[in-house]
Structure formats: structure tokens, C-alpha cells
């Protein structure tokens, strides 16, 4: 989680935060390298968020190769757990290389909640999504945080999610300070949905094969969203 420290230090008291989202880079190593090159050409980027599925089969070699490619980024990056990342011993490897599957950090005045939503891979035997983690985040908001962005691999109502508690999940997300929007991957598509008809948009990022990433800017005027092809 050294990258989280880098993000928090570099964005401390910044009034405008700009970040990119990539997802589902499994198998597509050349395209992932091209994504890194495209992102490195920007001079307006604070960090990169990878919403999971770095591996296809949960193999250590896959994670290491993805880590090595992503380490070529000029800016810090963080990675979420995808459903494919859970296969075989993938969860253990993910934790060793990238850290815990539920985590949060602050960039400027924005709290980023990064959540494991791959309930199917855990046979519904674990707290996925971890509502207690979300509640604790809501109860202990760091000083200076004014708004929130939530990231996950699988979006609500996908086959991966525990959809019995979808409304409950959204309720606690909305308890966070001024929830702006959510980002996710998994479906290998670009889409924008308002799953709960509550004004909160969910932005889906496509896979590396489709050679695009999402770019967000957050400031006092709200936020902007862009799909960038490379």
C-alpha cells in the first residue's frame, strides 16, 4: 500500500483530483502496456485505479507480470480484487502483492472506498460486500473529507454480487459524505447506469482488449467523465 501513501501525500489539500480507471487486463499484456504508455503521456493525472481481474486463472505469474507492467506508470496506482483474481490461490497472491481486498484512501477532499463485491467467488460464506467495513468508514471519516467515490469490480445486479442486499449496500454507500459516483469493471463494456434511481451513477470501464480507459475530474464544480480510447 505504499502507493496509497504516495497518492495521499501528492494530493494533500488539492482542490482538483484527476484519476483514470482501467479494468480487466487479464491476458491482454500488450494492450495493458499500451494503456500505461497512453496514461504516461498525460500531464494531468494524479493516480490510476484498476478495478480488478489482473489474472485469468489466479496464477502468481499473472499477478507479477501485471504488477511489473503497471509499475511503469509515472503516477501511483491501486488495484482491486476481481473475480478471476480469486481462482486457485489467487486471493493469497493478491493479498501478498497488492494488500487487502477492502481498503480506502483520501485524495484531496475525496474519500475513495475500494470494495470486494465478488460474493459468488466466496460462496456467500464471507461478508462480501463487507457492510461492516463500509459502516466503519462512514463512522470515522477523516478530517477534511467532503465527498466520496466508490470503486468495485462487479457492479450491483451482476451474477457476482450478493443481490439480496443490493439496496442495503447502496444505503450504506449513501451514508458516506456526498457520494459522487461509483466505478466498476467486470462486464467488458463501457456503460453508465443509475441502478437505484437515486441520482448516483455507476460507470463501467471496459477491458484492456477494447483499448479504452475512463478519466474523471473532481473539483468544487462537481465532476466530469470521459472515455478515452488509445
Which residues fall in each region the model found?
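Active-site glycine-centered loops adjacent to acidic/histidine catalytic or metal-binding residues
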Residues: 24, 52-53, 82-83, 153, ...
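His/acidic metal-ligating clusters that form di-metal
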Residues: 40-47, 122-199, 224
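Active-site-proximal beta-strand elements of phosphoester/diester hydrolases
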Residues: 16-26, 109-119, 149-153, 201-207, ...
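Binuclear metal-dependent phosphoesterase catalytic core
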Residues: 1, 6, 22, 105, ...
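Aromatic-lined substrate-binding rim segments of carbohydrate-active enzymes
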Residues: 61-78, 138-144
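Metal-dependent catalytic neighborhoods of phosphoester/phosphodiester hydrolases
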Residues: 32-37, 52-71, 86-99, 160-165, ...
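N-terminal active-site segment of His-dependent metallophosphoesterases
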Residues: 1-65
